[in-house]
């Protein structure tokens, strides 16, 4: 699939091919081909564009949410993990320009590269297309992902909730431990298993593709068990 064919699937007729090629160019490709520009500057702009439109979406759809809650939710949505999943969802990796070394190491599957290129492409659309086309792109990618996933659940801070309960009981023996980590080959990710311990006993267990995610899931498991034991 060519670059033009890929974007035509989203109703985007490219005007400036150079800016889109730049948005898809990794450092490794630029070094091998002596290309001057890479996606890094566009990534910078794309991050700001996404921040603005996601902020507007949250402001208009969560009219009673306080500023802190909106900020946390936005961070959950525009983080690397989420953006890389969106890039995978639309097969963006297939058109990224990588050097041979990155191709061999499957750079087209790496979350850091995928999320950066998604931001860079968003910037290219912002510069090359109308706002209507840009909004259509954002709706069909990042907002589509939001609709498929319970991001309200992602926004809930189980660790803070558990900490508040422990503090209310005047206890300070809450501890999180990394029990194990393993490489998930098909996803090219590290899955962590974290336990939460109270009074030296394991009360919750959780897994995730980051220590933070696994800790949140462990805290959620612990909260569920504490609530059941309180009945």
UniProtKB/Swiss-Prot annotation:
The main location class comes to cytoplasm
Per its UniProt record, the required cofactor names are: Mg(2+)
Chemical reaction(s) catalysed: Endonucleolytic cleavage to 5'-phosphomonoester
An example of a GO molecular function for this protein is: rRNA binding
Any Pfam family hit: dsrm
Query: What EC number(s) does this enzyme carry?
Result: 3.1.26.3
Q: Which GO cellular component terms, listed alphabetically, does the Swiss-Prot or TrEMBL entry include?
A: cytoplasm
Summarize subunit and interaction data from the UniProt record for this chain.
Answer: Homodimer.
User: What name appears for this protein in its UniProt entry?
Assistant: Ribonuclease 3
Q: Which organism is it from?
A: Mesoplasma florum (strain ATCC 33453 / NBRC 100688 / NCTC 11704 / L1) (Acholeplasma florum)
Instruction: Tell me the name of the encoding gene.
Output: rnc
